[in-house]
């Protein structure tokens, strides 16, 4: 049994505010890709999808003269740092297991290397989230401007919740029968 679902997260006005700011369609697409990758790589789908959904909630839009300035954004980007903290706080308030909330937050922190120099040795969970994000990227950050309705996003997240629940139930059943 999961403490917090994707639907629980999406129902929070605070979460929807930041998901829409960073690109709701991108967040949902990355969540779906993370589910598929996590299944393929035998990574916890619950943690992977939560981290994927929330991976960009730290975004701040950089404008110059009323226009989106992608170069200015890239120079000053710390969205993964801000997003990891926001996600952790949100998940704890929703009742997520503290260890799971930390794993999710750290996966968000390391989903990109845009704010630091050098390389990072990622865990399997962190790699799934990073790969899912990279798979949906478009030049100049255009992936953040794809459009999806809130109702369509809610339906897609509910479908993912169902798949994760079935997988969790199946895994629990298999563990009990061993």
Residue ranges and their predicted role:
Residues 10-13, 108, 129:
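A generic structural signal for nonpolar/aromatic side chains embedded in well-ordered alpha-helices
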Residues 17-29, 70-82:
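Active-site metal-coordination segments of metallo-dependent hydrolases
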Residues 61-77, 118:
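Metal-dependent catalytic cores of enzymes that make or break cyclic nucleotides
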């Amino acid at each position: 049994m999961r403490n917090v679902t994707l639907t629980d997260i999406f129902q929070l006005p605070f979460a929807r505010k930041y998901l829409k700011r960073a690109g709701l369609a991108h967040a949902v697409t990355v969540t779906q890709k993370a589910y598929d990758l996590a299944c393929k790589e035998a990574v916890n789908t619950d943690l992977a999808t939560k981290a994927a959904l929330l991976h960009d909630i730290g975004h701040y839009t950089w404008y110059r003269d009323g226009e989106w300035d992608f170069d200015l954004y890239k120079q000053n980007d710390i969205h993964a740092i801000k997003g990891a903290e926001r996600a952790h706080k949100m998940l704890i308030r929703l009742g997520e297991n503290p260890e799971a909330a930390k794993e999710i937050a750290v996966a968000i922190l390391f989903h990109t290397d845009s704010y630091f120099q050098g390389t990072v040795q990622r865990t399997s969970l962190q790699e799934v989230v990073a790969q899912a994000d990279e798979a949906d990227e478009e030049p100049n950050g255009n992936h953040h401007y794809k459009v999806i309705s809130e109702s369509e996003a809610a339906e897609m997240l509910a479908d993912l919740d169902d798949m994760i629940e079935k997988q969790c139930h199946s895994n629990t059943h298999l563990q009990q029968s061993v």
